[in-house]
Amino acid sequence: GAADLLPEWGKEYGIDMIPVNILFGEKSYLQGTELDNEGFYKLVDETKRIPKTSQPSPHQFVEFYRSIAQKGDTILSIHITAKLSGTYTSAVAAAEELKDEFKVIPIDSACGSLGIGLMCREARKMEKAGKSVDEIVQYIEGIKKVLSEGNPQQLDTIPLELPESLPSLD
């Protein structure tokens, strides 16, 4: 939803994203499923409106989690900061509802945009490397702390290998 996730990261690391609701006047669309980026910008041009967004409801999270997990699975669910959206709160409510089916660990990223994408990518890389859920959560919390506090002395601890498809800043 609110993560700026490079398309190749989503595919390469198998990252699932719950769509946010995009509202153009009275019409609502699910990001990515009912409205892709091209369609979004086309609607902005045609309607001359700035759309609004609405976080997924707890029910939408329950359905989403059930669509990507099986009984007994653990889901690490990283979200836009609760200071900007109710998404994290919806995820927490859904996690509580599903506690007898599987474990959902909602994380408030304390940021948005590319920071969330980075956390998701690193979590998947660690999972593929055989790290435990606790190790992954601890590492993501470390990235969150660096990104939210902005401590320049810790910047070298953030893994920022960018894909080759991005233009050079030189």
Segments the model singles out, each with a brief description of its role:
Residues 74-81, 105-108, 122:
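Short glycine-rich or small-residue beta-strand-to-loop segments that form or flank ligand, phosphate
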